[in-house]
């Protein structure tokens, strides 16, 4: 498949998880979403959902690739996964074309995933599980207090 930074952005994957992903780890759900069985740090497996619109691109690109094939195959080295370097090059090029942060990387997209999910109301525990963090403190780095906001707004008062 042609690599798409969208998978990283919506999945919050680490680069090692991305380049190690095989078709055996991509499961089509009835909803049209893709469920990724991601092998993270310490060989811990977690499930990450990819929205249907991006999942459709994934499934359409598979062709007759066997379950053991990398999802993101190298064009220069068929049968092998993209390298970390190639993935970050693609992310930087896409960021340049989109006019966003020229320092973009897979880690930057992972950070953006966490920050935007939390800002849009996702529970920090869910974000932590999605990212594969063993400690909630790690995820809390991505939670930013916004000017003009106060936790008092979330308390029930009479």
Feature map (PLM): residue ranges:
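Basic, Lys/Arg- and aromatic-enriched nucleic-acid-binding interface segment
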Residues: 1-15, 19, 44, 64
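Short alpha-helical segment immediately N-terminal to, or the first helix within
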Residues: 7-8, 21, 116-117, 130
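Short coil/turn motifs that cap or connect alpha-helices
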Residues: 14, 22-24, 101, 123, ...
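Conserved tyrosine-mediated DNA breakage-rejoining catalytic core shared by Y-recombinases
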Residues: 16, 20-58
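Catalytic-site neighborhood detector that most strongly recognizes the C-terminal catalytic loop/helix
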Residues: 42, 131-156
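Short, basic (Lys/Arg/His-rich) helix/loop patches that form interaction surfaces
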Residues: 48, 67, 88-129, 144
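Active-site/catalytic core of tyrosine-dependent DNA strand-transfer enzymes
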Residues: 51-101
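Ser/Thr-centric signal marking residues that sit
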Residues: 83, 105, 115, 138-139
């Amino acid at each position: 498949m042609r690599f798409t930074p969208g998978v990283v952005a919506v999945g919050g994957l680490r680069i090692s998880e991305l380049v190690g992903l095989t078709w055996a780890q991509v499961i089509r759900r009835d909803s049209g979403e893709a469920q990724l069985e991601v092998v993270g740090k310490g060989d811990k497996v977690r499930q990450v959902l990819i929205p249907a619109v991006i999942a459709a691109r994934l499934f359409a690109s598979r062709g007759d690739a066997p379950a053991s094939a990398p999802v993101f195959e190298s064009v220069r080295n068929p049968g092998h996964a993209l390298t970390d370097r190639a993935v970050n090059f693609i992310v930087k090029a896409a960021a340049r074309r989109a006019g966003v942060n020229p320092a973009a990387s897979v880690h930057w997209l992972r950070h953006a995933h966490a920050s935007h999910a939390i800002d849009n109301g996702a529970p920090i525990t869910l974000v932590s599980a999605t990212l594969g963090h063993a400690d909630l403190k790690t995820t809390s780095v991505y939670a930013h207090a916004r000017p003009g906001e106060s936790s008092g707004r979330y308390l029930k008062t009479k």
